[in-house]
Amino acid sequence: MIGTPYTEGARRAMLLGCGELGKEVAIELQRLGVEVIGVDRYPNAPAMQIAHRSHVINMLDAKALRAIIELEKPHLVIPEIEAIATQTLVEMEAEGLNVVPTARATQLTMDREGIRRLAAETLGLPTSPYFFCDTETEFNQAIGKIGVPCVVKPVMSSSGKGQSVIRDVSQSAKAWQYAQEGGRAGGGRVIVEGFIPFDYEITLLTISAVNGIHFCAPIGHRQEDGDYRESWQPQAMSADVLAKSQAIASKVVEALGGYGLFGVELFVKGNDVYFSEVSPRPHDTGLVTLISQDLSEFALHVRAILGLPIPNIHQHGPSASAVVLVEGKSKNIRYQGLADALAAENTQLRLFAKPEIDGRRRLGVALARDKDIESAVNKALDSASKVKVIF
């Protein structure tokens, strides 16, 4: 049962994290009559602009997080970022709080160690070789064992922060320092992974719903500096590789538990599929589903967490997304060139309405459909390039 917002019978959902992905989740929640409460570390975040009400707190502060949940008494708590005091969610879930998909899933995936050990050591899934390191000495020893090239990441980071590829041991000291600067909690533990010379990487959006496990068509993407630049759907792959990918994704999602959409990241090399990472929430590369599917990843996430069925997912054909990435400093961001950006057939644009920029930030995404993937990617890139950001 779902009541009406602002009434005694309202179904209340609290978003922990109010960025561009949280904004789309909020929109889908409101389409089904849910009262939305936005929480983030800074004011006027994208989802806050459309939520029924919002709060600014440090979500890594356990006392502050507990206090805001006890104040609002939400029926659902939906983590949309990793930088949260997850132990508080675990404790409150034991007291009866409904955390999406589960507090355990949120805690396991907030750092790379928890999910990697679950995938490789508990579930026995194929992954790259890896070591976790607390000191620079351990770090150098791990590089010696794995060899170069190898990949270094803080165990807690997002959007590529602190990640680097070591192609020669002379780069080790710089990579260690960069990883220490890029972690969400400051310096700390890192993972050193063997470099898989993959043919391509995919995000397999996997939904655990009341009527079973469902998959979106695989999404291909291009990364730069650890963050996505373009994504496309469907990624061409053989039926055998797709089946292997779905089997891996199913095992991970079922092990994490709960209802919701999960972004499962996989590497493909020939006929081999390797598990990389998973997010228990909509994935940035999945922004392409805003134009490629009848139900976007956000709509699917909301259906699942509300306990509603997903009878089918229709994919419209070759589609792509390209980010609007800007570098600068401003608290008065404006946009020009929108008419040119939207002049071509089957193009759409999402501007995230982020309140400020200080450095490099993703401010929007262009979306396109076309006769084939290459054409769709080029159309999305062309559209994104025509958006002019004025400071």
From Swiss-Prot:
Keyword Repressor tagged: no
Any GO BP: 'de novo' IMP biosynthetic process
Entries under Pfam families matching the protein: ATP-grasp, PurT_C, RS_preATP-grasp-like
InterPro entries noted in UniProt: ATP-grasp, ATP-grasp_carboxylate-amine, ATP_grasp_subdomain_1, PreATP-grasp_dom_sf, PurT, PurT/PurK_preATP-grasp, PurT_C, Rudment_hybrid_motif
Record-listed Mg(2+) binding positions: E265, E277
One annotated GO molecular function: magnesium ion binding
Residues noted as binding ATP in the record, renumbered to the chain: R112, K153, S158, S159, G160, K161, G162, Q163, E193, G194, F195, I196, E201
This enzyme's EC code(s): 6.3.1.21
Lineage top rank: taxon: Bacteria
One Gene Ontology cellular component: cytosol
Reactions catalysed: N(1)-(5-phospho-beta-D-ribosyl)glycinamide + formate + ATP = N(2)-formyl-N(1)-(5-phospho-beta-D-ribosyl)glycinamide + ADP + phosphate + H(+)
Keyword Metal-binding appears in the UniProt entry: yes
Residues where N(1)-(5-phospho-beta-D-ribosyl)glycinamide binds: E20, L21, E80, D284, K354, R361, R362
Associated pathway: Purine metabolism; IMP biosynthesis via de novo pathway; N(2)-formyl-N(1)-(5-phospho-D-ribosyl)glycinamide from N(1)-(5-phospho-D-ribosyl)glycinamide (formate route): step 1/1
PROSITE patterns linked: ATP_GRASP
Key words of the record: ATP-binding, Ligase, Magnesium, Metal-binding, Nucleotide-binding, Purine biosynthesis
Residues annotated as domain ATP-grasp: 117-306
Family: Belongs to the PurK/PurT family.
Complex formation: Homodimer.
Function description: Involved in the de novo purine biosynthesis. Catalyzes the transfer of formate to 5-phospho-ribosyl-glycinamide (GAR), producing 5-phospho-ribosyl-N-formylglycinamide (FGAR). Formate is provided by PurU via hydrolysis of 10-formyl-tetrahydrofolate.
Name the record gives this protein: Formate-dependent phosphoribosylglycinamide formyltransferase
Native organism: Shewanella sp. (strain MR-7)
Gene (name only): purT
